[in-house]
Amino acid sequence: MPPKFDPNEVKVVYLRCTGGEVGATSALAPKIGPLGLSPKKVGDDIAKATGDWKGLRITVKLTIQNRQAQIEVVPSASALIIKALKEPPRDRKKQKNIKHSGNITFDEIVNIARQMRHRSLARELSGTIKEILGTAQSVGCNVDGRHPHDIIDDINSGAVECPAS
């Protein structure tokens, strides 16, 4: 038997789920069942909290204390980029491995880099901006009508100025 669960203890559980959908509660059950929470209720709460990320795979952080779950959405860089593209949500089951052939501005890239700054491994914001540009390249979108890697080269050569913070 595992040790008895202390209700005042704060537990943090990370889950990957699709925005706006109630994931399989059977996947939630082994993680949050022992903590005294109903998987169905938590599944519904996650679906509510991730409503504006419809159709995107995102990480959700559950902070559990006193049998209460607080839900926090932790979006990845690619999820933020796809959201900035403002594409209509697509049906995930019909189309697989979608290339997002949109266009976003460099300012939006800088804003995303600021949001991701605390999770970045780069020392400066310019490094984080390059990380986000690399993700934009993987997603398949353009930045200001150009290929993201051309902008990374411009940042390295000094042709494009990055904000300091």
UniProtKB/Swiss-Prot annotation:
The keyword Ubl conjugation applies. Disulfide bonds: none annotated. The modification Phosphoserine is found at residues 38, 165. SUPFAM superfamilies: Ribosomal L11/L12e N-terminal domain, Ribosomal protein L11, C-terminal domain. One of its GO terms (cellular component) is synapse. There is a cross-link at residue 40 (Glycyl lysine isopeptide (Lys-Gly) (interchain with G-Cter in SUMO2)). It comes from the Eukaryota. Keywords: Acetylation, Cytoplasm, Isopeptide bond, Phosphoprotein, Ribonucleoprotein, Ribosomal protein, RNA-binding, Ubl conjugation. InterPro entries: Ribosomal_uL11 (IPR000911), Ribosomal_uL11_C (IPR020783), Ribosomal_uL11_C_sf (IPR036769), Ribosomal_uL11_CS (IPR020785), Ribosomal_uL11_N (IPR020784), Ribosomal_uL11_N_sf (IPR036796). It is found in: Cytoplasm. PROSITE patterns: RIBOSOMAL_L11. Ubiquitinated at Lys-48 and Lys-83 by RNF14 and RNF25 in response to ribosome collisions (ribosome stalling). GO terms for biological process: cytoplasmic translation; translation at postsynapse; translation at presynapse. There is a cross-link at residues 48, 83 (Glycyl lysine isopeptide (Lys-Gly) (interchain with G-Cter in ubiquitin)). The modification N6-acetyllysine is found at residue 54. Component of the large ribosomal subunit. The ribosome is a large ribonucleoprotein complex responsible for the synthesis of proteins in the cell. Binds directly to 26S ribosomal RNA. HAMAP family: Ribosomal_uL11. Component of the large ribosomal subunit. Mature ribosomes consist of a small (40S) and a large (60S) subunit. The 40S subunit contains about 33 different proteins and 1 molecule of RNA (18S). The 60S subunit contains about 49 different proteins and 3 molecules of RNA (28S, 5.8S and 5S). PANTHER family: 60S RIBOSOMAL PROTEIN L12 (PTHR11661), LARGE RIBOSOMAL SUBUNIT PROTEIN UL11 (PTHR11661:SF2). Belongs to the universal ribosomal protein uL11 family. This is Large ribosomal subunit protein uL11. The gene is Rpl12.
